Each structure stands twice: as C-alpha cells, then as structure tokens.
C-alpha cells in the first residue's frame, strides 16, 4: 500500500510540475502527407524528424527506397507498411518498428552515425523528457480525429499468433513542444496544433504507447 501511495504521489507531482514548466517548442518544420500520400502519415512524420536532424530527404524517397511494405491480406503492421501509402483505398498503416528501420536503412546506406529507435512502451513522461531535455521531437501513434480508437472488421495475426483488429482511425503525429498543460503536435494532415496534456496522454496510451525517436 505504501509503495502504491508513493507511486501515485510521484505521478501527481510530475503532472503538477508539467503544468508549471515553461513552454518548450522545437520548431519542427511542418510537412504534409497530401496530396501525394493520402495514407502516408507515418512516413511523413518520419520525414519531419529527418529534416529536424539535418537530413534533406523527402518522404517519397524514404518510402520508395527504405520502407518495408507488405501485401493487403493478413499483413502485420509490426513488420511493414500494409498496402500502398500513395493510394486512398489500398493503403493502411504500419507501427513503430518499420518506421525506425526505414530511417536506420537510410543511415546505414549513407554511413551516418545516427540511430532511430522504436520506443514502443515509452511512458508519456519519457515523451516529455525527449522534448524538454533531449530537445528531440517524437513520432507518436494517435488517431486521425482525436477521438477514441475505432476498428475495422478486418484483423491480422501477429508474430505471437494472436489475432489483432485493424484500426480505422489510426494516425501518426509529431510531438513538437510541451508546456503549461498542453502538448504541441504537428499533424501531417492538419498542421500544428495544441492538445490538452490529459487528452494526449489518454490517446497515446490507448494507441499502444507507440513512438519513434532519433
């Protein structure tokens, strides 16, 4: 009981401290998935991280040369992008591992001593730490409308043999800043906006705490 109380107290103090910290904005350059990639939010978000770190490479180049793709049927988004991000009707999504590996393929091919990391499972305070102390933006998996996750009737089987439903409103955004109880995100469809910290935390956790950093 004492341990539970101590952990709750730490969380409360951390949240209160977050509401008091000054605003930190990283000034990530906005990139948009449309018109060329109506289902390419993940690679567009990665493109923003690449440009922030000084690599002048386009989302199209990253997608065409380094992003692993899978077919449309029973494909696992943990291993590759399902379908074609250039297509409105035949493009779905991928999770963090293929996006991190896409960047790492680019780094290896060009002898660049950088590493992209799949940070799936990172706490929301880990996301804040990346922004405030490391001064690095974070790609996170979110929803396209800021509403709770919704699912298609279709599913896939993961590497553990578990059947998982496919999201119908999955989206990818870049966390660009924090402060005063708000989180600044750059949406590849809508551009930059601020969302309430509690709302951001709730959706981030509902979407599996998926994240990529460089």
Residue spans of the language-model regions?
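Active-site-proximal beta-strand/loop segments in catalytic clefts of secreted hydrolases
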Residues: 46, 65, 119, 141-145, ...
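Structural recognition of the beta-strand scaffold that forms the well-ordered cores
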Residues: 40, 137-142, 174, 184-186
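Extracytoplasmic
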Residues: 36, 134-135, 168-170
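Noncatalytic regulatory segments and standalone regulatory/sensor domains
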Residues: 148, 152-167, 173-214
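Mid-length scaffold segments of soluble, non-membrane domains
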Residues: 87-126, 130-133
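Short, solvent-exposed, low-complexity loop/linker segments
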Residues: 128-138, 142-150
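Active-site-adjacent structural segments surrounding the nucleophilic cysteine of cysteine proteases
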Residues: 2-101, 144-146, 152-166
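Loop/turn elements at helix/coil->beta-strand transitions in domains of secreted/extracellular proteins
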Residues: 110-112, 134-139, 179-182, 209
